[in-house]
Amino acid sequence: MLRKLAAVSLLSLLSAPLLAAECSVDIQGNDQMQFNTNAITVDKSCKQFTVNLSHPGNLPKNVMGHNWVLSTAADMQGVVTDGMASGLDKDYLKPDDSRVIAHTKLIGSGEKDSVTFDVSKLKEGEQYMFFCTFPGHSALMKGTLTLK
């Protein structure tokens, strides 16, 4: 009886990490103006969520730079428009834009960047979009982020 109890306890402990919420995602932005995903789900049990962005392409950031920006769906176009006006030296983001929930820096070929944000900034039922603010990229490089 004790052996069975010990075996069940051990299996429970070993499977716990498999049931834990995934509180990060790895995303790539390539030279074809594409993210490798168009949907991210954030588990509401996560206190923080991390996005790891990489650029496996060959082009530099002044030609094919990518960033990862999160806002509400309603704010996306305004963030993109104001970002284009801000220019390359500001990573195509308006400084201190309150509509931006989280963002990485602009990266080019072979570069990486990460951003971690508090999940408490997200509201269940709100529509969120992630996108790239490099001029012209948001038409293709975008996706949804959902809190569940």
Swiss-Prot record:
Signal peptide: 1-20
Alphabetical list of CDD domains matching this protein: Azurin
Superkingdom to which the source organism belongs: Bacteria
Annotated Cu cation binding sites: 66, 132, 137, 141
GO CC annotation: periplasmic space; plasma membrane
One family name in Pfam for this protein: Copper-bind
Disulfide pairings: 23-46
Annotated SUPFAM superfamilies: Cupredoxins
Plastocyanin-like domain segment(s): 21-148
Record key words, sorted: Copper, Disulfide bond, Electron transport, Metal-binding, Periplasm, Signal, Transport
Record-linked InterPro entries: Azurin, BlueCu_1, BlueCu_1_BS, Cu-binding_ET, Cupredoxin
Record GO terms (molecular function): copper ion binding; electron transfer activity; identical protein binding; transition metal ion binding; zinc ion binding
Cellular localisation: Periplasm
PANTHER family documented for this protein: AURACYANIN-B, OUTER MEMBRANE PROTEIN H.8
Function: Transfers electrons from cytochrome c551 to cytochrome oxidase.
Protein name per its UniProtKB record: Azurin
